[in-house]
Design a protein with these regions (language model features):
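Amphipathic alpha-helical repeat scaffolds
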Residues: 23, 43-47
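Thiol-/selenol-based redox modules, centered on thioredoxin-like
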Residues: 117-120, 124-163
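Structural microenvironment flanking redox-active thiols in thiol-disulfide oxidoreductases
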Residues: 50-115
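N-terminal "domain-start" segment that seeds a small globular fold
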Residues: 10-32, 52, 117
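Bacterial N-terminal signal peptides
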Residues: 1-7
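Local sequence-structure signature of Cys/Sec-based thiol-disulfide redox active-site neighborhoods
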Residues: 35-42
Length: 163
């Protein structure tokens, strides 16, 4: 009897569930708590030309939260210094101007050695082009915790590309 050895190499994708953030109120957000739900993550800034997208993101949240969609906004000052000076100011700005009800993290570093590991993971999983170059990059995570799509700042949350 002849045994033929077959070997296949494949890459096992890492999931988003390894990451944690701090909420805008200082509470820990464990992404593993959202296993089995799709997650839409957006890096945001309060004083950006794309800030109007907060309204579209909130609309998306209201439309799909009943289906389990989790939306997380990640304020950052890394692109053009366009974020407010404190978490409290960001929280108030979002509440007053956009009536935000989705999850917001604390102001978070994205770029450089001190950048949040989530964004290094995005680059590893989807390549250099997926790494945020500006505010309001968007990342869609499937129910298994895998990054399935990303969108640049110019893609509005209510675009047919995202729905």
């Amino acid at each position: 009897m002849l045994m033929i050895g077959i070997s296949m190499t494949f890459e096992v994708k890492a999931s988003v569930y390894q990451f944690n953030f701090n909420s805008i109120d200082g509470k820990e957000i464990n992404l593993k708590d959202f296993k089995g739900k799709p997650i839409f993550i957006v890096n945001t800034a309060s004083l950006c030309g794309f800030t109007y997208q907060y309204s579209d993101i909130e609309t998306l949240h209201q439309k799909y939260k009943k289906d389990g969609l989790i939306i997380i906004g990640i304020p950052s000052n890394d692109f053009g210094n366009q974020e407010l000076s404190s978490n409290q100011k960001v929280k108030e700005f979002c509440a007053i101007n956009f009536d935000i009800s989705f999850i917001l993290t604390e102001i978070t570093k994205i770029k450089g050695e001190k950048g949040h590991p989530f964004f290094r993971w995005v680059k590893k999983e989807a390549g250099f082009l997926a790494f945020p170059k500006w505010n309001f990059y968007k990342f869609l995570i499937n129910k298994e915790g895998l990054l399935v799509k990303w969108y640049a700042s110019t893609t509005r949350p209510n675009s047919n590309k995202i729905k």
